[in-house]
Amino acid sequence: MAIAIIAEYNPFHNGHIYQLEYTKKNFPNDKIYIILSGNFTQRGEISLADFKTKSKIALKYGADFIIKLPFEYATQAAHIFAKGAIKIVNQHKIDKIIFGSESNDVENLYKLANLWNQNQEAYNAFLKYALKLGYSFPKASAFALEEISGQKIVFPNDILGFEYIKQIVANNYPIRAYTLKRSEEFSLKNPEPNIASATYLRQLVNENKSISRFSPMKFIHPVCSLPNLYPEFQKIVRETSAENLAKIWLISEGIENLFKKHINEPNFEKFLNAVNSRRYTNSRIKRAMVYILFRIEDPSQFDEEKIQLDCWKNQGF
């Protein structure tokens, strides 16, 4: 018997420690597997710590086994991220997963996943309609689900958890999902006394502020971040033709021309704001930037271990 947690640990923090302790307490007979993304994340971020460091800290705080989520899944949209993660869970004959959920209503997520599975033709028609209107893929997916179910999934952990359960249902995997209540106030503006979101902690780290109240991890500047690589990204986009940029994975729908149009923006934030639109979310743009930076044409053949950034060398716990 085993249970999986699908994680990025960017960075590992007290909320993750609580999740591991909760899982050990409530599933005492199960080995805990962490399906862990590597040096890059689903939102197109460069991980503050590398895979080896994240693995060590997870094992220290209660995980039994670490399985790497391949780059080709770890740096994709939520539905592809979930597809890869749940496929690995099934391949290792792990019969349970547990994830944080704002609603903590796993039965409703199963209900919606079954409804989606039984009405895929209608769902896909609504999805295509919304995409033609210029919606981003996440917003188009939310629109299609609401059209067939009358429900919106609002919170980010519920959205990702729903994608996990969709994969379980669609593939008839012998896996049962469980949820751990996650507060909606677990955010930038309202960190709890010793627990805060990874987004908030990344902000603190990037501002060279201590996160010791919230995490056992320690970071030394300069830290790994996409903004720090923006000058290199500018150089590549300026020197590469639009035709050759379009050969890179995730560079489609003319986004290469949009990048070239705004490549003279003076910094990462201004570039992101210039390119962001109803169709292109920040995460979609950042994932594309990562693929351009490392010239990745086929993510299934990309060995991220060959990328050794100096900013990973002194990060630890």
From Swiss-Prot:
Entries under InterPro entries matching the protein: Rossmann-like_a/b/a_fold (IPR014729), tRNA(Met)_cyd_acetate_ligase (IPR008513)
GO molecular function: ATP binding; ligase activity, forming carbon-nitrogen bonds; tRNA binding
Pfam family, one: HIGH_NTase1
Keyword tags: ATP-binding, Cytoplasm, Ligase, Nucleotide-binding, RNA-binding, tRNA processing, tRNA-binding
Subcellular localization(s) per the UniProt record: Cytoplasm
Cystine crosslinks: none
Annotated GO CC locations: cytoplasm
Keyword tRNA processing assigned: yes
EC supergroup of this enzyme: ligase
Gene Ontology biological process terms in this record: tRNA modification
Positions annotated to bind ATP: 6-19, 100, 157, 182
Gene3D superfamilies named among the record's database cross-references: HUPs
Reactions mediated catalytically: cytidine(34) in elongator tRNA(Met) + acetate + ATP = N(4)-acetylcytidine(34) in elongator tRNA(Met) + AMP + diphosphate
Main location: cytoplasm
EC number from the UniProt entry: 6.3.4.-
Family: Belongs to the TmcAL family.
Function: Catalyzes the formation of N(4)-acetylcytidine (ac(4)C) at the wobble position of elongator tRNA(Met), using acetate and ATP as substrates. First activates an acetate ion to form acetyladenylate (Ac-AMP) and then transfers the acetyl group to tRNA to form ac(4)C34.
Database matches in PANTHER family: TRNA(MET) CYTIDINE ACETATE LIGASE
Protein name per the record: tRNA(Met) cytidine acetate ligase
